[in-house]
């Protein structure tokens, strides 16, 4: 509403307050159906009201019913009534904020991407993954979780396409479907009273609102994330998730994923845009009033807990110890497994995707109670984009669609879901094909037809040669935190005894010795002493002598935060090296 209209409203309100109060309902002078109160525009054609409360009240957010200012709205008012107040009107600029957010645009700036980081990226356009591959050709299905009313962003949409109720009424969110005309909204046949209740009962987003989409990402409940499923809507098991359970903390998603101006912090390693560039993408466990000081290096011991975690927090993410498994199955029938492999050559029942048996979902392998893979992550990712040249990862033998960046000296050890897929790629230029998932899932069900449609959508000829390849992805695990009494055992990373003849889990992460055992150990030992066979005894080297022996005496890693002796520092190294010096590379 313009300032002129608001001023007119306030002036009219002052006049109304000066008039004597008469019994009975006011006359509906403008015939708009609102007569519970004197309407803003009953005697002023230059302004309008959105409900019988009137939009020109001195305290607009209170309305005539302070507990529910939307109580007199009806379904026909949606979204016009919302826009009149929330698009630069008396209630704020929420439409403008939401319209520009990643939740609506599905693309955004990508400061955390090493692959074409200066470009706009997102699921609306160029994102490719090992699930539904790419959205090209499949807006009717993939777009059903878009925060809009049906129109694809950039194709004639406007702020009126923003679907407020998707996040602000959980009953509406559960009943929201793709309608025959392509729009999104309540299913046909929904009772008028139910429709009216959607616009009359507006609330902050609940877990149900968020999970209606996020739990079903990738094509089904719990399919994509491994740590997010519909079970979190009403979970009461602390061991399933200590934060999101109705018998415990009962946190809402936005308690951690803080929103400002409809932009949110926090995203997975495989997601490209950063919604709020100023605040960044990371949710920290010790922010605000939660777990204060636990990342300080002394917080665990100070709180009366074990002290070992304190020496890990600088290099190990909280999730690595506090989420020992994902896709949990604790005997509750609502808990669901997660997808670990997908093969587009076959339908879900194992039959060939040749169109004979009709449309259907691709074949998937789903598992529960999975142990994460661990990688060092520095918050940067290399995520495949449409038309990128595919390059095999020599460590896995597969084409990656998402890789967390970092190494033993750069980043924190973080738990990941590792997942594979079989999907098509062009032969000549080795680019992953955006198989037309709508053709596959809702059309013929023929993989060849879906590939040909995808090729055409990408600008290739329909007969462009293709091949089947294996892809893989890493996805950070962040939800499903266990109670503090049930953290991962040290053996999840540290084997019970040392075996220097083969690579351990930690060796594979960069902790292997920097040279042959005999040469590394000979710096300090003459061979007469047996090698410690346990991790804790080996770790005691950092407590030796005046300063402690630095990690890079034996490994190609540095832990400067511990202030240990560096082998290149002659002022302290002589205290430890008393046998055969190792040829360390010193600057």
Model-derived features: where do they sit?
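N-terminal signal peptide c-region/cleavage motif recognized by signal peptidases
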Residues: 18-20
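Sequence context of c-type cytochrome heme-c attachment sites
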Residues: 55-206, 212-286, 292-309, 414-420, ...
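Extracellular calcium-associated, cysteine-rich motifs in secreted modular proteins
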Residues: 24-62
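Soluble extramembrane regions of membrane proteins in the secretory/endomembrane system
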Residues: 368-412, 421, 428-460
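Bacterial N-terminal signal peptides that target proteins for export
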Residues: 1-10
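Repeat-solenoid scaffold signature
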Residues: 281, 286, 290-402
